[in-house]
Amino acid sequence: MCRDMLPQDIFDYDPKNLWDYYYKDGIYYIDHHQSHATYAFLNSNFEQSDILAIDGIGSKYRCVFFDKDQNLIDLSDELPIGWLWNHMSNLTGFGTLGASKLMGKVGYGKYSEYYYNIFETILNGPITEKKQKHFQHIKLDNIDNLAHTLQKFTIDKIKEYVYPLKTCDNLC
């Protein structure tokens, strides 16, 4: 396995800044979310920006925020939105890594208070990588509405947790 071939201290790498990196014995490494954030920033053409990277998995994080000075703030516990999208895409038949397919349904649905409350309840519970057995009790009578509501939920959570951290007008 690839993990066995890498130096063990690479797994202890803990970036504090957007441009931090691990380098040893010819191995260059940056964190998965750091990579997403860097790509977003470099392609934004902003000279300065806050950056948000949300994803379902990564070696260390689920969600990170970089302020305008490029300092990393770990929001993995507060905002595991990518994790929720992954689990909902699996539940709706799009597969564990099919969140983009579920996102494609957003424009076809309507807001559902039922789904919104479900998402609130889920994020108030344990966030684990294992399949959540209680998810099977979620009614899937309208996947379009689930997707639409999950997008609204995502935006609301970003406003709740990320907007207070903003240090400039730009956000990647």
Predicted regions and their residues:
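Short glycine-rich phosphate-binding loop at a beta-alpha junction
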Residues: 1-8, 167-172
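Conserved catalytic cysteine-centered active-site region
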Residues: 12-31
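Short coil/turn segments at beta-strand junctions that form active-site/ligand-binding loops
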Residues: 25, 47-49, 167-170
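Short, surface-exposed alpha-helical recognition segments that flank or form part
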Residues: 25-28, 141-153
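Conserved phosphate-binding catalytic cores of ATP/NTP-utilizing and phosphoryl-transfer enzymes
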Residues: 28-52
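Conserved active-site and cofactor/substrate-binding residues in soluble primary-metabolism enzymes
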Residues: 32, 79-83, 149, 153-157
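A short helix-loop
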Residues: 47-144
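Phosphate/ATP-binding catalytic cores across multiple sugar-kinase/actin-like superfamilies
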Residues: 148-171
